Amino acid sequence: MSLKEFTLDWRGETLRGELRTYPHIGNPVIQLYDEEGMPYTTASINLPYSLPEGLIVIRTSENNSLLVALETAGIVERTGQTIPVGYACAHLCRVLI
């Protein structure tokens, strides 16, 4: 997957987003940066196995509103499946960009 950039409005901030792949297994990662270019948050979780093409795991244990913002912006959509991650569950989503 090549680098894809986007902007995301979340919690009153305009963030620059990058969709790329984790280096080890190649699963997609969404990293968000603030207006100064500093890392803001990572929206995804890397699992120890490869995901099917076009899918990403979005963590919501701390920030469910982040998933809503990503959906509203047309970046991802929920598949309806969740994946246990530690003591929480994360949402399996389709990448739309």
Regions found by a protein language model. Name each.
Residues 59-97:
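Short, compact, well-ordered microdomains
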Residues 32-75:
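Acidic, aromatic-enriched beta-alpha/helix-loop junctions
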Residues 2-42, 50-53:
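Catalytic phosphate/metal-binding cores of nucleic-acid and nucleotide-processing enzymes, i.e., regions
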